[in-house]
Amino acid sequence: MNFNKFLIIISCYLACVFALANQNDGGDDDSKTKKTTTWVWVTTTIGGQLATISTAYSQKFISTHSSEDAKSVASGEIGLGSLSGSVGGIKTYSQTTITNANIAPSNNNVFLGIESLYTGIVGGIVLILGLL
């Protein structure tokens, strides 16, 4: 009888872990955005003690314009006080490449097919402790 209760508790715990680990942050799979996660260190005060923890920081970048949008811009001049410029031209920017050297591990690492396993385990433990 105790073994059955143990199996039920473990099954519920694992279900919570899987549910918490795969939340997809509400993003669409077919969107044109790309999610990039960076691990950052955050220093805070907890209970009067200084604590430094790592946490995931992510940004999403989307395309801000297309070539078709640029064709519809009318030519002309624009100014603000002593500042002036032209409208309708396509401005090019130099490209900066950022490398991945010496970065913290990202959540792209998959353990047994489960992303963010650590987050799911911690969330499951908090959930179980909350039920007690």
UniProtKB/Swiss-Prot annotation:
Covalent lipid sites (GPI-anchor amidated asparagine): 100
Annotated GO biological process: adhesion of symbiont to host; cell adhesion involved in single-species biofilm formation; filamentous growth; filamentous growth of a population of unicellular organisms; fungal-type cell wall organization; negative regulation of filamentous growth of a population of unicellular organisms
Function comment: Plays a role in cell wall stability and rigidity. Required for normal adhesion to host cells and for adherence during biofilm formation. Necessary for proper oxidative stress response.
UniProt-listed InterPro entries: Kre1
Pro-peptide region(s): 101-132
Primary residence: membrane
Protein name (record): Predicted GPI-anchored protein 1
Entry keywords, A to Z: Cell membrane, Cell wall biogenesis/degradation, Glycoprotein, GPI-anchor, Lipoprotein, Membrane, Signal, Transmembrane, Transmembrane helix, Virulence
Compartments in which it is found: Cell membrane
Induction and repression of expression: Induced during cell wall regeneration following protoplasting.
GO cellular component: plasma membrane; side of membrane
Species of the source: Candida albicans (strain SC5314 / ATCC MYA-2876)
Keyword Membrane: yes
A Pfam match: KRE1
Signal peptide feature range: 1-19
Segments passing through the bilayer: 110-130
Membrane topology recorded in Swiss-Prot or TrEMBL: Lipid-anchor; GPI-anchor
Similarity comment: Belongs to the KRE1 family.
